[in-house]
Amino acid sequence: IEAVTNRGYRLLPDNDIFDGETIKKDIDFDCRVVFYDSIDSTNTQAKRMISDGADDVFLVVAAEQTAGRGRQGKSFYSPADTGVYMTFVVHPNTALQNAVGITTAACVAVCRAIEKITDITPQIKWVNDVYVNGKKICGILTEAVTDFETQTVSSVVIGIGINISTEHFPDGIENASSLNVNVKRAQLVSAVANELNRLVCSPFSDYIDYYREHSMLIGEDIYFIKNGEKTYAKALAIDSDGALEVELENGETETLRSGEITVRKK
Protein backbone atom coordinates (compact mmCIF):
# COMPACT_ATOMS: atom_id res chain seq x y z
CA ILE A 1 0.00 0.00 0.00
CA GLU A 2 1.32 3.42 -0.96
CA ALA A 3 0.28 6.70 0.63
CA VAL A 4 -1.02 9.28 -1.82
CA THR A 5 -0.96 12.92 -0.70
CA ASN A 6 -4.46 14.22 0.06
CA ARG A 7 -6.04 11.12 -1.46
CA GLY A 8 -5.58 8.40 1.17
CA TYR A 9 -4.03 5.17 -0.04
CA ARG A 10 -3.67 3.34 -3.31
CA LEU A 11 -3.20 -0.41 -3.60
CA LEU A 12 -0.09 -1.50 -5.48
CA PRO A 13 0.78 -5.05 -6.52
CA ASP A 14 2.56 -7.10 -3.88
CA ASN A 15 6.30 -6.95 -4.40
CA ASP A 16 6.18 -4.75 -7.49
CA ILE A 17 9.92 -5.08 -8.02
CA PHE A 18 10.85 -3.04 -11.07
CA ASP A 19 14.43 -3.50 -12.23
CA GLY A 20 16.37 -4.95 -15.13
CA GLU A 21 16.89 -8.37 -13.56
CA THR A 22 13.18 -8.86 -12.85
CA ILE A 23 12.25 -7.81 -16.38
CA LYS A 24 14.91 -10.04 -17.94
CA LYS A 25 13.78 -13.26 -16.25
CA ASP A 26 10.41 -13.24 -18.04
CA ILE A 27 11.74 -12.35 -21.50
CA ASP A 28 11.69 -15.45 -23.70
CA PHE A 29 14.37 -14.47 -26.24
CA ASP A 30 17.96 -13.22 -26.20
CA CYS A 31 17.72 -9.54 -25.31
CA ARG A 32 19.90 -7.17 -23.34
CA VAL A 33 17.94 -5.11 -20.78
CA VAL A 34 19.24 -1.69 -19.70
CA PHE A 35 17.28 -0.21 -16.79
CA TYR A 36 17.20 3.31 -15.33
CA ASP A 37 15.32 4.66 -12.34
CA SER A 38 15.18 7.94 -14.28
CA ILE A 39 16.34 8.98 -17.76
CA ASP A 40 15.64 11.88 -20.08
CA SER A 41 14.10 9.65 -22.76
CA THR A 42 14.42 5.93 -23.43
CA ASN A 43 14.33 6.58 -27.20
CA THR A 44 17.06 9.21 -26.91
CA GLN A 45 19.19 6.87 -24.80
CA ALA A 46 18.67 4.01 -27.25
CA LYS A 47 19.84 6.19 -30.14
CA ARG A 48 22.89 7.24 -28.11
CA MET A 49 23.71 3.56 -27.61
CA ILE A 50 23.32 2.86 -31.35
CA SER A 51 25.58 5.82 -32.09
CA ASP A 52 28.14 4.30 -29.71
CA GLY A 53 28.10 1.05 -31.68
CA ALA A 54 25.35 -1.09 -30.11
CA ASP A 55 24.23 -3.58 -32.76
CA ASP A 56 22.44 -6.19 -30.65
CA VAL A 57 18.74 -6.50 -29.82
CA PHE A 58 18.21 -4.52 -26.63
CA LEU A 59 15.58 -2.96 -24.41
CA VAL A 60 15.90 0.35 -22.55
CA VAL A 61 13.46 0.70 -19.64
CA ALA A 62 12.89 3.52 -17.15
CA ALA A 63 10.65 4.11 -14.14
CA GLU A 64 10.58 7.81 -15.05
CA GLN A 65 11.37 10.01 -18.05
CA THR A 66 12.26 13.65 -17.53
CA ALA A 67 12.02 14.52 -21.24
CA GLY A 68 9.78 11.84 -22.71
CA ARG A 69 9.01 12.35 -26.40
CA GLY A 70 5.86 11.74 -28.41
CA ARG A 71 4.95 12.04 -32.07
CA GLN A 72 5.19 15.28 -34.02
CA GLY A 73 7.59 16.83 -31.52
CA LYS A 74 5.18 16.57 -28.59
CA SER A 75 6.31 15.62 -25.11
CA PHE A 76 5.13 12.44 -23.36
CA TYR A 77 4.26 12.85 -19.68
CA SER A 78 6.24 10.16 -17.83
CA PRO A 79 6.01 10.55 -14.03
CA ALA A 80 7.90 8.24 -11.68
CA ASP A 81 6.47 4.91 -10.61
CA THR A 82 3.01 5.17 -12.23
CA GLY A 83 3.79 3.85 -15.69
CA VAL A 84 6.31 1.97 -17.80
CA TYR A 85 8.53 3.66 -20.38
CA MET A 86 10.46 1.38 -22.68
CA THR A 87 12.31 1.34 -25.99
CA PHE A 88 12.88 -1.85 -27.97
CA VAL A 89 15.64 -1.80 -30.59
CA VAL A 90 16.00 -4.17 -33.53
CA HIS A 91 18.26 -4.07 -36.58
CA PRO A 92 16.24 -5.29 -39.57
CA ASN A 93 18.52 -4.08 -42.40
CA THR A 94 15.47 -3.72 -44.59
CA ALA A 95 14.16 -1.19 -47.08
CA LEU A 96 12.47 1.82 -45.51
CA GLN A 97 9.03 0.95 -46.85
CA ASN A 98 9.26 -2.50 -45.23
CA ALA A 99 9.87 -0.91 -41.82
CA VAL A 100 6.67 1.16 -41.88
CA GLY A 101 4.57 -1.72 -40.54
CA ILE A 102 6.59 -1.88 -37.33
CA THR A 103 4.46 0.86 -35.73
CA THR A 104 1.37 -1.23 -36.44
CA ALA A 105 3.10 -4.27 -34.96
CA ALA A 106 3.95 -2.28 -31.82
CA CYS A 107 0.27 -1.37 -31.30
CA VAL A 108 -0.73 -5.00 -31.62
CA ALA A 109 2.06 -6.10 -29.25
CA VAL A 110 0.91 -3.68 -26.52
CA CYS A 111 -2.73 -4.74 -26.86
CA ARG A 112 -1.93 -8.45 -26.81
CA ALA A 113 0.31 -8.04 -23.75
CA ILE A 114 -2.41 -6.13 -21.87
CA GLU A 115 -4.99 -8.78 -22.78
CA LYS A 116 -2.69 -11.57 -21.60
CA ILE A 117 -2.06 -10.22 -18.12
CA THR A 118 -5.30 -8.29 -17.40
CA ASP A 119 -9.03 -8.60 -18.14
CA ILE A 120 -8.91 -5.42 -20.24
CA THR A 121 -9.59 -5.35 -23.99
CA PRO A 122 -7.81 -2.26 -25.38
CA GLN A 123 -8.65 -0.47 -28.60
CA ILE A 124 -6.37 1.08 -31.21
CA LYS A 125 -6.71 4.62 -32.48
CA TRP A 126 -5.03 4.76 -35.88
CA VAL A 127 -2.23 4.95 -36.29
CA ASN A 128 -0.41 4.22 -33.04
CA ASP A 129 -2.31 5.07 -29.85
CA VAL A 130 -3.84 2.52 -27.48
CA TYR A 131 -7.10 3.41 -25.72
CA VAL A 132 -9.14 1.97 -22.86
CA ASN A 133 -12.71 3.15 -22.21
CA GLY A 134 -12.33 5.91 -24.78
CA LYS A 135 -9.17 7.40 -23.29
CA LYS A 136 -5.51 7.12 -24.28
CA ILE A 137 -3.39 4.95 -22.01
CA CYS A 138 -0.40 4.33 -24.29
CA GLY A 139 1.63 6.22 -26.86
CA ILE A 140 4.12 4.78 -29.34
CA LEU A 141 6.98 6.59 -31.08
CA THR A 142 8.83 4.62 -33.74
CA GLU A 143 12.04 6.05 -35.17
CA ALA A 144 14.30 4.65 -37.89
CA VAL A 145 18.08 4.90 -38.12
CA THR A 146 18.84 4.79 -41.84
CA ASP A 147 21.85 4.14 -44.02
CA PHE A 148 21.66 6.77 -46.76
CA GLU A 149 24.10 4.95 -49.05
CA THR A 150 22.13 1.71 -49.18
CA GLN A 151 18.70 3.28 -48.54
CA THR A 152 18.04 0.72 -45.83
CA VAL A 153 16.95 0.90 -42.22
CA SER A 154 19.83 -0.26 -40.04
CA SER A 155 18.00 0.10 -36.71
CA VAL A 156 14.42 0.64 -35.58
CA VAL A 157 13.79 2.32 -32.23
CA ILE A 158 10.32 1.52 -30.84
CA GLY A 159 9.37 3.72 -27.89
CA ILE A 160 6.34 2.77 -25.79
CA GLY A 161 4.87 4.57 -22.79
CA ILE A 162 1.99 2.98 -20.85
CA ASN A 163 0.12 4.75 -18.05
CA ILE A 164 -0.65 2.21 -15.33
CA SER A 165 -1.82 4.27 -12.36
CA THR A 166 -1.20 7.91 -13.29
CA GLU A 167 -4.09 9.92 -11.82
CA HIS A 168 -3.31 13.53 -12.66
CA PHE A 169 -2.12 14.86 -16.00
CA PRO A 170 -0.77 18.36 -16.75
CA ASP A 171 -2.93 20.97 -18.42
CA GLY A 172 -2.94 20.53 -22.16
CA ILE A 173 -2.95 16.73 -22.05
CA GLU A 174 -6.47 15.84 -23.07
CA ASN A 175 -8.26 12.51 -23.06
CA ALA A 176 -5.51 10.66 -21.17
CA SER A 177 -6.07 7.93 -18.62
CA SER A 178 -4.44 4.83 -17.13
CA LEU A 179 -4.94 1.08 -17.04
CA ASN A 180 -5.89 1.35 -13.36
CA VAL A 181 -5.41 -2.35 -12.71
CA ASN A 182 -3.26 -4.29 -10.29
CA VAL A 183 -0.38 -5.22 -12.59
CA LYS A 184 3.34 -5.63 -12.00
CA ARG A 185 5.35 -3.25 -14.15
CA ALA A 186 8.15 -5.72 -14.89
CA GLN A 187 5.60 -8.32 -16.02
CA LEU A 188 3.98 -5.82 -18.39
CA VAL A 189 7.31 -4.77 -19.91
CA SER A 190 8.36 -8.39 -20.44
CA ALA A 191 5.00 -9.28 -22.01
CA VAL A 192 5.20 -6.35 -24.43
CA ALA A 193 8.81 -7.19 -25.35
CA ASN A 194 7.96 -10.84 -26.02
CA GLU A 195 5.05 -9.88 -28.27
CA LEU A 196 7.16 -7.27 -30.06
CA ASN A 197 9.93 -9.74 -30.76
CA ARG A 198 7.45 -12.14 -32.36
CA LEU A 199 5.73 -9.48 -34.46
CA VAL A 200 8.50 -7.24 -35.81
CA CYS A 201 9.85 -10.05 -37.99
CA SER A 202 6.42 -11.36 -38.98
CA PRO A 203 4.64 -10.52 -42.24
CA PHE A 204 2.03 -7.78 -42.03
CA SER A 205 -0.69 -10.29 -42.85
CA ASP A 206 -0.05 -12.08 -39.53
CA TYR A 207 -1.41 -9.24 -37.42
CA ILE A 208 -3.35 -6.77 -39.58
CA ASP A 209 -6.66 -8.55 -38.87
CA TYR A 210 -6.08 -8.18 -35.12
CA TYR A 211 -5.27 -4.50 -35.66
CA ARG A 212 -8.52 -4.02 -37.61
CA GLU A 213 -10.62 -5.88 -35.03
CA HIS A 214 -9.31 -3.61 -32.26
CA SER A 215 -9.73 -0.36 -34.19
CA MET A 216 -11.92 2.26 -32.50
CA LEU A 217 -12.25 4.40 -35.65
CA ILE A 218 -14.18 2.38 -38.22
CA GLY A 219 -17.56 4.01 -38.88
CA GLU A 220 -16.68 7.08 -36.81
CA ASP A 221 -16.88 10.69 -37.94
CA ILE A 222 -13.37 12.13 -37.82
CA TYR A 223 -11.28 15.04 -38.95
CA PHE A 224 -7.64 15.45 -39.91
CA ILE A 225 -5.44 18.36 -40.90
CA LYS A 226 -4.77 18.71 -44.62
CA ASN A 227 -2.97 21.71 -46.10
CA GLY A 228 -3.34 23.46 -42.75
CA GLU A 229 -7.11 23.06 -42.60
CA LYS A 230 -9.48 20.63 -40.88
CA THR A 231 -10.83 18.04 -43.28
CA TYR A 232 -13.97 16.19 -42.17
CA ALA A 233 -14.54 12.56 -43.10
CA LYS A 234 -15.88 9.17 -42.03
CA ALA A 235 -13.44 6.33 -41.31
CA LEU A 236 -14.30 3.41 -43.58
CA ALA A 237 -11.65 0.72 -43.27
CA ILE A 238 -8.01 -0.16 -42.70
CA ASP A 239 -6.42 -1.58 -45.84
CA SER A 240 -3.95 -4.44 -46.17
CA ASP A 241 -1.02 -2.02 -45.74
CA GLY A 242 -2.41 -0.50 -42.53
CA ALA A 243 -3.52 2.74 -44.21
CA LEU A 244 -6.84 4.34 -43.24
CA GLU A 245 -9.52 4.64 -45.92
CA VAL A 246 -11.88 7.56 -45.37
CA GLU A 247 -14.90 9.08 -47.11
CA LEU A 248 -14.77 12.86 -47.44
CA GLU A 249 -17.84 15.09 -47.10
CA ASN A 250 -18.08 15.38 -50.90
CA GLY A 251 -18.38 11.59 -51.21
CA GLU A 252 -14.86 11.02 -52.50
CA THR A 253 -12.62 8.46 -50.81
CA GLU A 254 -9.06 9.05 -49.70
CA THR A 255 -6.35 6.81 -48.25
CA LEU A 256 -4.34 8.19 -45.32
CA ARG A 257 -0.90 6.72 -44.64
CA SER A 258 0.17 9.04 -41.83
CA GLY A 259 -1.09 11.94 -39.78
CA GLU A 260 -3.15 12.69 -36.69
CA ILE A 261 -6.82 11.70 -36.59
CA THR A 262 -9.39 13.16 -34.19
CA VAL A 263 -12.79 11.56 -33.54
CA ARG A 264 -15.55 14.15 -33.74
CA LYS A 265 -17.66 14.41 -30.60
CA LYS A 266 -21.29 13.55 -31.11
Where are the regions that the model predicts?
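Long, positively charged amphipathic alpha-helical accessory segments at protein N-termini or as interdomain linkers
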Residues: 94-122, 132-266
